[in-house]
């Protein structure tokens, strides 16, 4: 991991762009989080400028030809790029429990929800699916006790409240289909250049 800091105008963005271009050139896929919205230019060749010509002469570069790089844009909200999503099922109970900051008892209930979904060949795609599952578990708690343990109403209600918190933070945009995978971020183009994946996080 590289940490680049400095005052405004010291070249932080340019440093990041140069590194991304270098990695892409040698076939290494790159993932960038675009905080300010100024990295999209990697996809386009730079416009001619006297300062660029002056720099090329100074460092001995001949026949400089600017070019764009293979870029894929991602956006959690799907406005400025492909929507970046996953499903509740793919996230799994352990990571979801951590996200929701559940205690051990509540985490156990969440594991039971995933187990019930697996046993019944049900997919938990988004937060609505998980809410429906928890509601069903609360209604059928007595019938399921022998197989899945004590599904207490208080713990189920606590999980529902934690879901409300993450929904207020717009987390529902992150869950759903089509689900992105790590392979989507590890691609090269037909020329062997690493694809630069740029995630727009200006609204996060």
Where are these regions (language model features)?
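Short, small-residue-biased leader/transition segments that mark boundaries at the very start
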Residues: 1-2
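Hydrophobic positions on the alpha1 helix immediately C-terminal to the Walker A/P-loop
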Residues: 15, 19
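P-loop NTPase motor domains
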Residues: 20-29, 37-204
């Amino acid at each position: 991991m590289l940490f680049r800091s400095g005052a405004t105008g010291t070249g932080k963005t340019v440093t990041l762009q140069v590194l991304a271009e270098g990695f892409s050139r040698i076939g290494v896929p790159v993932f960038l989080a675009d905080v300010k919205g100024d990295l999209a230019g990697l996809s386009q060749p730079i416009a001619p400028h006297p300062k660029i010509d002056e720099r090329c002469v100074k460092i001995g570069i001949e026949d400089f030809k600017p070019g764009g790089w293979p870029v894929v844009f991602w956006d959690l909200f799907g406005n400025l790029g492909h929507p970046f999503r996953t499903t509740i099922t793919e996230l799994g109970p352990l990571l979801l429990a951590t996200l929701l900051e559940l205690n051990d008892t509540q985490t156990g209930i969440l594991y039971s929800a995933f187990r019930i979904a697996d046993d019944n060949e049900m997919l938990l795609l988004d937060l609505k699916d998980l809410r429906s599952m928890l509601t069903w578990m609360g209604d059928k708690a007595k019938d399921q006790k022998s197989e899945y343990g004590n599904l207490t109403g208080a713990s189920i209600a606590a999980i529902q409240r934690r879901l409300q918190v993450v929904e207020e933070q717009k987390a529902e945009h992150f869950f759903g289909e089509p689900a992105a995978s790590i392979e989507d971020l590890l691609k090269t183009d037909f020329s062997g250049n690493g694809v630069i994946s740029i995630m727009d996080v200006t609204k996060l």
